[in-house]
Every structure is written in structure tokens, then in C-alpha cells.
UniProtKB/Swiss-Prot annotation:
The modification N-acetylthreonine is found at T29. It comes from the Eukaryota. The keyword Transmembrane helix applies. The lineage of its organism: Eukaryota, Sar, Rhizaria, Cercozoa, Chlorarachniophyceae. PSII is composed of 1 copy each of membrane proteins PsbA, PsbB, PsbC, PsbD, PsbE, PsbF, PsbH, PsbI, PsbJ, PsbK, PsbL, PsbM, PsbT, PsbY, PsbZ, Psb30/Ycf12, at least 3 peripheral proteins of the oxygen-evolving complex and a large number of cofactors. It forms dimeric complexes. This is Photosystem II CP43 reaction center protein. Residues 1-28 form a propeptide. The modification Phosphothreonine is found at T29. GO terms for molecular function: chlorophyll binding; electron transporter, transferring electrons within the cyclic electron transport pathway of photosynthesis activity; metal ion binding. Binds multiple chlorophylls and provides some of the ligands for the Ca-4Mn-5O cluster of the oxygen-evolving complex. It may also provide a ligand for a Cl- that is required for oxygen evolution. PSII binds additional chlorophylls, carotenoids and specific lipids. Keywords: Acetylation, Chlorophyll, Chloroplast, Chromophore, Manganese, Membrane, Metal-binding, Phosphoprotein, Photosynthesis, Photosystem II, Plastid, Thylakoid, Transmembrane, Transmembrane helix. It is a multi-pass membrane protein. Belongs to the PsbB/PsbC family. PsbC subfamily.
Length: 487
């Protein structure tokens, strides 16, 4: 019994050493012991200076300051970059030739553009930049105030804004507030599109125009049908949306569901199964957020690369399939004028040189672009009939604006690499074009990927902490502690 007792004592002592409060002091080490700020040093919080907001996990007032300041930085970038793009903008050139990523978004919302996506007024873009800059100043002052002067914790003075991470009811209330704000943001787009000036619709007759969306799709079968589609091939899940009515209708549904979902989460308490299923800690919520924003990043990647309705080609440049199809169309127009019989001409493989049959029997463009046979674009659709491309329309109905747009898109394929070596390999050195679609798709894919890895990292740590076996490195025996200080 004595031996057993001593054995347990040894085990308890070792457990105290490994699993004491020091298990929250992870492997970060201050490089300079003088960097101590108001009780937010490593010894107090368990996190070194470069762990940033982790030092503020239990200081709700200071964490509020960090978040408000962060929002200020984001809005400042938006305003500054907006004004930078306005200052460099050349109205005579397409937006996608000028490396712009913010002005195309404003143009898509219907600001400053007219028929065909032509920019007729840059003043709204200037106003947008100034409004964001002023807003960022307000947020910046708020961030500084709450970081330096405001209360360290909010629970005592402002209980409505205070919280404890383990308080499941408070956490779902905060979730509900966020959902309502997101829902209101979604409805702002609906109101802009339906009542306040409209949005740019690339499918408007004659090559696109700004118009009011007065008949948004509210059929649940249509809207939720996108979610039930396959993400592969020509199905394309929600990325396949190809009209503004469905886009605005989708925002009506999303906005409404988020508002009602927010009210639900504010007025109810989490059910027992949810209390058991989730880890309820600050790091767990971080991991959930990272997973969600990772998914948004991957969806934005596919949307900006493939979709030419939400991301009109007039502003973002053609999609890959669109540039390929426009090349086939351009040479069909040229050779038809030179006397070629585009319906029967054969290419070197014996297949149709200009036109051929798709797997489903439709008439499609021939040649290498056959792989993009199911492409749909506003400059091409008027030339289709009940069975694919209409021969009679190709011979008699091609409009000058379609020729011009196809020629422009043909020479602006989204092929540039991100080190700004643009164009195809055979292009002359003077050509250096990188499509905004290349930038937006690759950047969102990379960011989505790293957020995904961050989700795994923080989810693993949160689950380990909840299970009680997150111990890190035993700092007492760490070799570096026996070495001489660098200074």
C-alpha cells in the first residue's frame, strides 16, 4: 500500500508539472523581456508579444479595440486603394486592362457606367473612396480608444457587450446578432438592385446595361436548385447562375433566412445536443470562423474565374472558355467574309474547322475550343437557335458590337501568371496582360487554402484543450534555457 501510495504521489507531482497552469504557456518565448504592456506579457497571459490578440482572450474591452482597429485597417485599404484606382483610371481603356479589382465591383453595382459597360462618370468612384477613408478614421479612433483608454473588460460596466467564452447562451446571441447584420447587408444589395438605380446586367439587350431588377426570382425550387446541383462539369453548383433575377432572388432568400436565423439564435438557448457536440471556447470559435471563411474563399475563387454574370466580362475580362470561344468566332467571321463555307469546311483532323456537333447534337464551334462547347455569353447567345448555333444567324445576323467584343476578348484571355508575365507563350514581349480574374481567383484560392489549414490548426488545439491533454513542451527541461543569453 505504501509503495502504491508513493507511486501515485510521483505521478501526481509529474502531472502538476506538466498539466499545471503552465500548459497554457505555449512554446512562444519573448526575444526581449522588456516588452511588457499593462499585464499583457507572456507570464500573465501565456502568449508572447507576437501572438497578438491571443494575449487578449480574456480582456473583452481590449479585444474589442483590436477588432475595431482591424476593421479600420480593412476599410482604410478599401478607401485608399479605391482612390488609387480612380487616380490611375483611363476611361478609354477597359477596366480589365488596367489591373483594377475595386472599380469593377463598383461598376457591377451600377455606379458610373452606361450601355455596354462604358464608364460615363468616375465621380461615384471618388465618393466611394472618400467615404471609406472617413469611415476608417472613425474606426481607427475607436480602435485606439478601446485599446488604450477604454476598460480592459466590458462585463462589469457594459454587460450587454461583455461575454465569457464558455457562456453558450451569450455566444449564440452574438451569433444571432452577426447573422442579422449579414442579412441586412444582403438586403442592401436587393434594395440597390430593385429600387435605387439598379445594377449592371451583362445580359441586357445590345451588350449589357444598368437596369432595375423588378422581377427577382423567389421560387425556392429555382434558388435551392442551385445548391442541389453537382459542382462538376456543366452543372457548376451555385457558380452556374446566369441571370441577375436569380442572383438578386438568392440574396432575398439568404438575407431573409439570416435575419430570421439571427432572431432564432438570440431568443433561444442551444439545444443539449449542440452543447455536447461543439467545443465552447474562444479558439474553437476562431476555428469555426476560419472554416467558414475558407469555404467562402474557395467559392469566390470559382465565381470570379468561371462566372460572367456576377462578374461581368466587360469589367473583369473574359473567362477562359469565353476567350477561347471568342477566338473561334472571330476567325469564323473573318473567313466567312473571305468566302469560306463555314458550315462544311474541314480542319486538319477531318472534324469541322469552324462548326461541328456537340456530344448532344448541338451545333458548336469547331477546333480546340470544342471543349468549351457549353459556354454561355451575352455576345454569343443571340446567335443560337433551338439546336445550338444557328447557321442562318451566323451568316446574316452578326452585329458589329459582337465582332468587336469577341476580338477584344480573344486578345485578353486570362492566361497571365502572377509574376506579371502575361499572355500566351508566343506573344511579343511588349504585351504584358494579367486578367483581374487571374488575380482574384488565385488569391482567393491561396487565402482559402491557408484559412483551411488554420482551421485544422486551431480546431486541433481547441479540442485538445477541451480534452485536457494540451501540454506543449516541458519548459523546465528545454535545452535552450541552459544556454547563455544572446546579449
Amino acid at each position: 500500500m505504501k509503495v502504491l501510495e508513493l507511486g501515485w504521489l510521483h505521478k501526481i507531482n509529474r502531472t502538476r508539472r506538466l498539466y499545471s497552469l503552465r500548459r497554457y504557456y505555449h512554446v512562444e518565448t519573448l526575444f526581449n523581456g522588456t516588452l511588457v504592456t499593462g499585464g499583457r506579457d507572456q507570464e500573465t497571459t501565456g502568449f508572447a508579444w507576437w501572438s497578438g490578440n491571443a494575449r487578449l482572450i480574456n480582456l473583452s474591452g481590449k479585444l474589442l479595440g483590436a477588432h475595431v482597429a482591424h476593421a479600420g485597417l480593412i476599410v482604410f485599404w478599401a478607401g485608399a486603394m479605391n482612390l488609387f484606382e480612380v487616380a490611375h483610371f483611363i476611361p478609354e481603356k477597359p477596366m480589365y486592362e488596367q489591373g483594377l479589382i475595386l472599380l469593377p465591383h463598383l461598376a457591377t453595382l451600377g455606379y458610373g457606367v452606361g450601355p455596354g459597360g462604358e464608364v460615363i462618370d468616375t465621380f461615384p468612384y471618388f465618393v466611394s473612396g472618400v467615404v471609406h477613408l472617413i469611415s476608417s478614421a472613425v474606426l481607427g479612433f475607436g480602435g485606439i480608444y478601446h485599446s488604450i483608454l477604454g476598460p480592459e473588460t466590458l462585463e462589469e460596466s457594459f454587460p450587454f457587450f461583455g461575454y465569457v467564452w464558455k457562456d453558450k447562451n451569450k455566444m449564440t446571441t452574438i451569433l444571432g446578432i452577426h447573422l442579422i447584420l449579414l442579412g441586412l447587408g444582403s438586403w442592401l444589395l436587393v434594395l440597390k438592385a430593385s429600387y435605387f438605380g439598379g445594377v449592371y446586367d451583362t445580359w441586357a439587350p445590345g451588350g449589357g446595361d444598368v437596369r432595375l431588377i423588378t422581377d427577382a426570382t423567389i421560387s425556392p425550387a429555382t434558388i435551392f436548385g442551385y445548391l442541389l446541383k453537382s459542382p462538376f462539369g456543366g452543372d457548376g453548383w451555385i457558380v452556374s447562375v446566369d441571370n441577375m433575377e436569380d442572383i438578386i432572388g438568392g440574396h432575398i432568400w439568404i438575407g431573409t433566412l439570416e435575419i430570421f436565423g439571427g432572431i432564432w439564435h438570440i431568443t433561444t438557448k442551444p439545444w443539449p445536443w449542440a452543447r455536447r457536440a461543439f467545443v465552447w471556447s474562444g479558439e474553437a470559435y476562431l476555428s469555426y470562423s476560419l472554416a467558414a471563411i475558407s469555404l467562402m474563399g474557395f467559392i469566390a475563387c470559382c465565381m470570379s474565374w468561371f462566372n460572367n454574370t456576377a462578374y461581368p466580362s466587360e469589367f473583369y475580362g473574359p473567362t477562359g472558355p469565353e476567350a477561347s470561344q471568342s477566338q473561334a468566332f472571330t476567325f469564323l467571321v473573318r473567313d466567312q467574309r473571305l468566302g469560306a463555307n463555314v458550315a462544311s469546311a474541314q480542319g486538319p483532323t477531318g472534324l469541322g474547322k469552324y462548326l461541328m456537333r456537340s456530344p448532344t447534337g448541338e451545333i458548336i464551334f469547331g477546333g480546340e475550343t470544342m471543349r468549351f462547347w457549353d459556354f454561355r455569353g451575352p455576345w454569343l447567345e443571340p446567335l443560337r437557335g433551338p439546336n445550338g448555333l444557328d447557321l442562318n444567324k451566323l451568316k446574316n445576323d452578326i452585329q458589329p458590337w459582337q465582332e468587336r467584343r469577341a476580338a477584344e476578348y480573344m486578345t485578353h484571355a486570362p492566361l497571365g501568371s502572377l509574376n506579371s508575365v502575361g499572355g500566351v507563350a508566343t506573344e511579343i514581349n511588349a504585351v504584358n496582360f494579367v486578367s483581374p480574374r487571374s488575380w482574384l481567383a488565385t488569391s482567393h484560392f491561396v487565402l482559402g487554402f491557408f484559412f483551411f489549414i488554420g482551421h485544422f490548426w486551431h480546431a486541433g488545439r481547441a479540442r485538445a484543450a477541451a480534452a485536457g491533454f494540451e501540454k506543449g513542451i516541458d519548459r523546465d527541461d528545454e535545452p535552450v534555457l541552459s544556454l547563455k543569453p544572446l546579449d
